[in-house]
């Protein structure tokens, strides 16, 4: 039995979520293994309160952004900055920044993909991206719609943008055959603009 391409795309994204979670766990283990040694390093200085607060606020903002796609792991946010714990907390905040950086590129890809699809207004539907299903589409009542029940145009739109955002790399050559197939005319101009923008960012060639 042939699996619809839209379902394969969703499964692929689900696997990417799992891969990034494994990367985060591996990076966390690597960093945590040297925590005591680095804490005892006399050359490591603590941040002043202003620096610490700035870093903490930036970390909180990143965590809130990541929550949208379920990327945020269990994190304890320091409450206060007591003098006797300044070095420990300074090291902790640095470590959390390094751990969360594992998700940076993937989060940006998710955000771009989400934005591109959402801008196309999928006939009173919205797209959700998460680690459980990869891609989920729901209607205005938040009822889930099977991906293979979307119109052919909507499926093609999701597939094309997924390949654009997650498959091509810098200096790649991307060939797109009949992009107008089943797509609403109103989507085409914006889609071409998005493709040109991505080609410029990645310095790649797109042949349509």
Label every PLM stretch briefly.
Residues 1-81:
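Electropositive, glycine-dotted interaction segments
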Residues 4, 46, 83, 90, ...:
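Short, well-ordered helical secondary-structure segments
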Residues 10, 18, 25, 33, ...:
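A sequence-composition feature that detects small, non-aromatic residues
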Residues 11, 21, 29, 86, ...:
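Residue-identity detector for glutamine
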Residues 33-53, 83-97, 122-132:
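Short, charge-rich amphipathic segments
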Residues 51, 60-113:
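Charged, surface-exposed helical/loop "interaction arms" that form contiguous linear patches used
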Residues 102-208:
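Switch/communication elements of ASCE P-loop NTPase nucleotide-binding domains
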């Amino acid at each position: 039995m042939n699996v619809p391409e839209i379902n394969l795309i969703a499964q692929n994204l689900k696997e990417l979520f799992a891969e990034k979670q494994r990367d985060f766990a591996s990076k966390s283990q690597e960093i945590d293994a040297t925590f005591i040694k680095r804490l005892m390093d006399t050359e490591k200085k603590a941040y002043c309160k202003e620096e610490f607060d700035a870093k903490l606020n930036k970390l909180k903002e990143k965590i809130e952004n990541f929550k949208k796609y379920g990327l945020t792991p269990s994190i304890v946010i320091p409450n206060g900055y007591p003098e006797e714990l300044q070095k420990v907390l300074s090291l902790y905040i640095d470590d959390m920044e390094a751990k969360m950086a594992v998700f940076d590129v993937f989060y940006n890809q998710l955000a771009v993909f989400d934005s591109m699809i959402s801008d196309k207004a999928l006939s009173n539907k919205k797209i959700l991206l998460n680690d459980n299903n990869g891609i989920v589409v729901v209607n205005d009542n938040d009822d889930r719609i099977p991906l293979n029940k979307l119109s052919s145009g909507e499926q093609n739109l999701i597939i094309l943008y997924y390949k654009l955002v997650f498959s091509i790399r810098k200096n790649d050559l991307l060939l797109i055959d009949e992009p107008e197939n089943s797509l609403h005319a109103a989507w085409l101009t914006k889609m071409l603009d998005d493709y040109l923008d991505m080609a410029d960012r990645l310095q790649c060639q797109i042949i349509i």
